[in-house]
């Protein structure tokens, strides 16, 4: 069964725009889980535009109490900046169920491309080793590229998360070539025994098509 992990960044963005703690991340995390989600996802960024470091312990506690997964996304190379302690320091403090590594820069609006694992192999390997030593499942954000899947297998990642922004656009335009690229990538990942997550712009209209391409563990 494909599991659903809900990203609560936008709830945090609204909260921060209003100041105070309304809407409450804790309240809505519980509501999301009670509604059937299998996990909560956050992506803390150095500019603290939405998720803040002090949110993480409360969300972690809720996910443990309600027996669902906690997935923290981010760039492992982001270092301490003001009140942001650095990404790996956050991971070390919280030790989530899953850590999804994304290649965003600090000023990026949203995740919009995957890693070049070939060029980042050695640095990513060090991070993946740390995650494994701490019993944190690793996931690496990639584009639907067979070469990157081979590199992901070689570097030792537990899962890959396929960036599905272009898939969603191709679905709207009925772009069969792009859709076929995603199908091929998911089938190949299944063949080489890399577990697959997928994320970005998925909705009730396009999700069934994506899930028909193969075994996807989480969206």
Please annotate each region the language model reported.
Residues 1-69, 76-78, 82-85, 92-94, ...:
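Conserved N-terminal beta1-alpha1 strand-loop-helix module at the mouth
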Residues 1-17, 109-113, 124-133:
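N-terminal small/glycine-rich loop or linker at the start of catalytic domains
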Residues 2-8, 40-42, 68-74, 97-101, ...:
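Hydrophobic faces of well-ordered beta-strands that scaffold small-molecule active sites
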Residues 7-13, 45-47, 73-79, 102-106, ...:
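Active-site beta-loop-alpha junctions enriched in small/polar residues
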Residues 38-59, 103-116, 164-176:
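Glycine-rich, proline-tolerant flexible connector loops at the mouths of alpha/beta enzymes
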Residues 49-74, 117-139, 175-200, 204:
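Alpha-helix-loop-beta-strand connector modules within alpha/beta enzyme cores
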Residues 79-93, 145-155, 198, 202-217:
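Catalytic cores of alpha/beta
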Residues 137-192:
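Histidine/lysine/aspartate-rich catalytic loop segments that bind and position anionic ligands
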């Amino acid at each position: 069964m494909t599991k659903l992990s809900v990203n609560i960044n936008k709830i945090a963005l609204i909260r921060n725009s209003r100041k105070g703690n309304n809407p409450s991340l804790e309240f809505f995390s519980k509501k999301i889980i009670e509604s059937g989600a299998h996990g909560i996802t956050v992506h803390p960024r150095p500019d603290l535009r939405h998720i803040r470091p002090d949110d993480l312990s409360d969300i972690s506690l809720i996910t443990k109490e309600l027996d669902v997964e906690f997935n923290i996304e981010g760039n492992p190379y982001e270092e301490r900046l003001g009140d942001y302690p650095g990404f790996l320091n956050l991971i070390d403090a919280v030790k989530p169920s899953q850590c999804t590594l994304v290649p965003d820069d600090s000023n990026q609006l949203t995740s919009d491309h995957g890693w070049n694992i070939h060029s980042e192999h050695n640095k990513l390997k060090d991070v993946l080793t740390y995650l494994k030593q701490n019993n944190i499942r690793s996931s690496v954000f990639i584009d639907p590229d067979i070469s990157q899947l081979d590199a992901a297998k070689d570097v030792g990642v537990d899962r890959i998360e396929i960036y599905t922004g272009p898939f969603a656009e191709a679905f709207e335009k009925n772009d069969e070539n792009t859709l076929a690229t995603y199908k091929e990538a998911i089938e190949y990942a299944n063949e080489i025994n890399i577990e697959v997550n997928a994320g970005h712009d998925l909705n009730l209209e396009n999700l069934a098509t994506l899930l028909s391409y193969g075994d996807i563990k989480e969206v």
